[in-house]
Amino acid sequence: MPSRLIALVCLMTVAASAALADAKEDANKQTVLAFYEVALNKKDAEAAVRYLGAKYVQHNPSAADGAEGLKGFIQFLRDKFPQSRNEVKRALADGDFVVLHVHSVREPNTRGRAIIDIFRLENGKIVEHWDAIQDIPEKAANSNGMF
């Protein structure tokens, strides 16, 4: 009987840990999706920086680190591509990482680009970002589409 009780307690502990991990991943995903909307679609720099941690590391070689780097990028979008729009096609979370698959269109009536954005969070704040960007070609070698 005691061994069954120990097994039950262990099983409940594992289940509770998994539920907490799922809740954290979902919260991280929602944070990144909200950030993406205010930063890239609304282009609201002040709202966007509230989602960043004290230190924000940017791995895109065209963007600077920190809140000021993000503000500069958002200002660039406001100035050069005020009608740009980003549609998140997929959002995946794994621990402290959130990955987005995005259709980004900088100018209306263009094909746009496919983007994979990877974010790392600490304590619910975005602290690191990577991306890979690919133009959507006029003609593809297959009919699968990029999304």
Describe these PLM feature segments.
Residues 18-147:
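C-terminal and inter-domain tail/linker signature
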Residues 6-16:
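Bacterial N-terminal signal peptides
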